[in-house]
């Protein structure tokens, strides 16, 4: 096995380092797995991940969000709770975020190179301004508003 030293491998190493420095385990683990895949016989599975990775990730994320409801740790609200203006605002924000995520998927599919900038910006935000990584889909959705892309 020979290691491939190219710009993609270098970018993945930089993302691993930035992930470690900013305590962003999602970026660290993702970049490390992709680097491992790129440098080994697992490279043949990269096109599969490229084609289905976002869908699989959204499925896993949705399972993670719904699990507390299924386990009983979070109770479904009574109907009266939906009359509260804060609940309606929460529903509206949820709709907005889902819409932005949809725009983000479209933008990332059309211009995947922008994902690197979004990841670096997210990592810098976590490392230096106390931010929390909310995910590249929402960031890409917000970026699509500035770029005028849908």
From Swiss-Prot:
Location relative to the cell: Cell membrane
UniProt keyword Transmembrane helix present: yes
InterPro entries the record matches: UPF0756_TM
TM segment ranges: 12-34, 52-72, 79-99, 123-143
Membrane topology reported for the UniProt record: Multi-pass membrane protein
Assigned GO CC terms: plasma membrane
Pfam family for this entry, one: DUF441
Key words of the record: Cell membrane, Membrane, Transmembrane, Transmembrane helix
HAMAP family: UPF0756
Family: Belongs to the UPF0756 family.
Protein name: UPF0756 membrane protein PM0771
Organism for this UniProt entry: Pasteurella multocida (strain Pm70)
């Amino acid at each position: 096995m020979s290691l491939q030293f190219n710009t993609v491998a270098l970018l993945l190493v930089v993302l691993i380092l930035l992930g470690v420095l900013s305590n962003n385990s999602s970026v660290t683990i993702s970049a490390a797995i992709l680097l491992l895949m790129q440098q080994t016989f697992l490279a043949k599975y990269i096109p599969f991940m490229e084609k289905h990775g976002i869908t699989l990730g959204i499925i896993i994320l949705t399972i993670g969000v719904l699990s507390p409801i299924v386990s009983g740790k979070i109770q479904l609200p009574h109907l009266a709770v939906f009359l509260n203006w804060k609940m309606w605002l929460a529903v509206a924000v949820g709709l907005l975020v889902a819409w932005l995520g949809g725009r983000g998927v479209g933008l990332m599919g059309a211009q995947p190179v922008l994902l690197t900038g979004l990841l670096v910006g997210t990592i810098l935000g976590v490392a230096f301004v106390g931010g929390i990584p909310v995910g590249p889909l929402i960031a890409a959705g917000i970026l699509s508003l500035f770029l005028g892309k849908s």
